[in-house]
C-alpha cells in the first residue's frame, strides 16, 4: 500500500451491562495487536469485528505497520486476541500488554495435558442371539451408535459381537437390551494357562551319561587297585620271573 492510512472507529452506544463491567477498572486499557492487513476490505472487516468485542470502545488500524490498537475497559487482553483470531481467521499476535508468565505456563500445561492424554481402547465380546440377517443389522446399528465405539465385528455361527473402542461396556449392554429386547451376556476373557512346575523334571545328577555319579573324568577312567597275593605276578616255575615282563 503506497499511502498508509489510519482507520479510527468509535463504538457508539454501550449497553448497561457493559458499563457495569467497565466501572470495575479505573482507566481504559490500550491493547496493541499485530495482524496482517491485505486490502481496504480486510481492514474494514477486522475493525468491524474488533468493535463487537467486549469492553472495546475505540479501534485504530495502522496498515503500514500491521498493528491494531484496541482501547477500552478490556479485562483480559489474551482472550480478546484469541477471540479476534477465531472470528477473523487470521493470525493475531499480542504485542502489548505482554501476557503474564503464569498464563503462558498454564496454556502450555493445558496443551501438554491434551497431547499426553491417551484414551485406552478396550475390546469386549458379547453373546447375543443373532439368528437372521435382520437381527445382525439391528445389532450393528445399535452398537455403532453407542458413544466411543470404533469397530464392530459379528460372528453369526458363534452368535458373538466383538466391540472395540473407548466406550463404557455397561452402556453398550444396556443399549442392546433396550433396543433389541434380548439377553446380552459379556463373554469373560480366557486366562492364560500357567506352566506346571511340579511336573517339570530337574536333573540334579553330576557326571557323564555313561558314568553317572562318578563326577567329571575328562576322558580318563578312575584309578583301580589290583587285589591278590603278590606271588600271582610271578611264574610258578621260576618265582624270580615277572609275568608283567
From Swiss-Prot:
Extent of Basic and acidic residues compositional bias: 99-113
Ranges where the HMA domain occurs: 28-92, 121-188
UniProt keywords, alphabetically: Lipoprotein, Metal-binding, Methylation, Prenylation, Repeat
Coiled-coil stretches noted in the UniProt entry, renumbered to this chain: none
InterPro entries, sorted: HIPP01/3/5/6, HMA_dom, HMA_dom_sf
One GO MF term: metal ion binding
Region of interest: Disordered: 91-113
Propeptide part(s) removed at maturation, as residue ranges: 243-245
Disulphide-bridged cysteine pairs: none
Residues bearing PTM Cysteine methyl ester: 242
Sites where the protein binds a metal cation 2: 132, 135
Lipid-substituted positions (S-farnesyl cysteine): 242
Positions with a binding annotation for a metal cation 1: 39, 42
Family label: Belongs to the HIPP family.
Function statement: Heavy-metal-binding protein.
Protein name per its UniProtKB record: Heavy metal-associated isoprenylated plant protein 1
Gene: HIPP01
